[in-house]
């Protein structure tokens, strides 16, 4: 999917220690690409720049970066755009989320705020790049996972580990397309090297479309367990959630409501333009240390 010779180098990876960043930098190394990394938790080592995109002295500390892969949420990016352009940015790939549409009507205040930040971040990137002649690509993944590291599928595995079973709100018939962070890292690199992806936004679903229940059963299997799924009436599920909420940091009642919603997207434009070909959903939690 990626052709190193088509990348304009050197590359700057922002959010290098993020979930996607942890997979992107080994890929760039394997391709022999010259790159540097920006992270607020960067080690004191060659090729790393410690800082945030909003730091007032960022420009002075950055190396030349004609290509930028922004691998943290897109709302972090706008404060750093001027500094990145000053260091030669010509090509930008940034990550938003399909949540910008799937959670647009959520009654949850936190989710409403996240949707606003995503939408505002996307608009700021488009507007800046249009004025400054920077080719942009915005990637919108579905449900991101990386065994033992994410806050989506791995949280589900943690709940299964604690309870021994998984309660569903209703039958869990809503569609899901979990996508691995490593596939997203490959997509960012491929899009940066693909002129057809200039000035476009893409949805990036995973390699399989499953019901929520099927996805949960795959998680059980990936843990080496027999699936034990318990469908509950939505009202009863909400009551159980309210009692268990202290044990579920970051979870919201809307997660139960969405178990019956179809959150499926079309990845064919990304496949046609830069070879998007994500893996099927077969997580391997039982291989974790």
State where each predicted segment sits:
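N-terminal Rossmann NAD(P)H-binding glycine-rich loop of SDR-like oxidoreductase domains
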Residues: 9-31
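A short C-terminal helix-loop "cap" of Rossmann-like NAD(P)-dependent dehydrogenase/epimerase domains
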Residues: 157-169
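Active-site Tyr-X1-5-Lys
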Residues: 112-137, 154
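SDR active-site strand-loop-helix element
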Residues: 14, 38, 71, 92-98, ...
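Mid/C-terminal beta-alpha module of Rossmann-like enzyme folds, strongest
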Residues: 190-251, 267, 273-289
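NAD(P)H-binding glycine-rich loop region in Rossmannoid oxidoreductase-like domains
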Residues: 43-89, 94, 98-109
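Flexible, glycine-rich beta-alpha linker
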Residues: 137-155
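Substrate-positioning beta->alpha
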Residues: 150-155, 169-192, 199-200
């Amino acid at each position: 999917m990626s052709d190193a010779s088509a990348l304009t180098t050197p590359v700057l990876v922002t959010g290098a220690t993020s979930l996607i960043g942890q997979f992107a930098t080994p890929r760039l190394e394997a391709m022999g690409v010259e790159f540097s990394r920006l992270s607020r938790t960067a080690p004191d080592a060659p090729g790393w720049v410690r800082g945030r995109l909003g730091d007032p002295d960022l420009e002075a500390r950055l190396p030349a970066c004609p290509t930028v892969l922004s691998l943290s949420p897109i709302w972090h990016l706008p404060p750093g755009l001027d500094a990145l352009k000053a260091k030669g940015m010509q090509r930008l790939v940034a990550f938003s989320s399909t949540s910008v549409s799937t959670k647009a009507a959520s009654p949850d205040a936190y989710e409403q705020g996240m949707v606003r930040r995503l939408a505002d971040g996307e608009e700021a990137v488009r507007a800046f790049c249009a004025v400054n002649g920077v080719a942009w690509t915005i990637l919108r993944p579905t449900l991101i996972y990386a065994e033992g590291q994410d806050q989506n599928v791995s949280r589900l595995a943690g709940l299964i580990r604690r309870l021994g079973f998984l309660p569903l709100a209703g039958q869990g018939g809503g569609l899901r397309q979990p996508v691995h962070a490593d596939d997203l890292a490959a997509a960012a690199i491929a899009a940066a090297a693909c002129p057809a992806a200039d000035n476009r936004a893409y949805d990036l679903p995973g390699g399989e479309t499953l019901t929520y229940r099927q996805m949960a059963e795959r998680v059980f299997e990936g843990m080496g367990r027999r699936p034990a799924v318990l469908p509950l009436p939505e009202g009863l599920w909400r009551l159980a959630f309210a009692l268990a909420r202290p044990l579920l940091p970051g979870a919201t009642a809307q997660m139960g409501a969405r178990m019956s919603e179809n959150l499926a997207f079309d990845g064919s434009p990304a496949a046609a333009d830069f070879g998007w070909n994500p893996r099927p959903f077969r997580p391997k939690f039982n291989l974790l240390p």
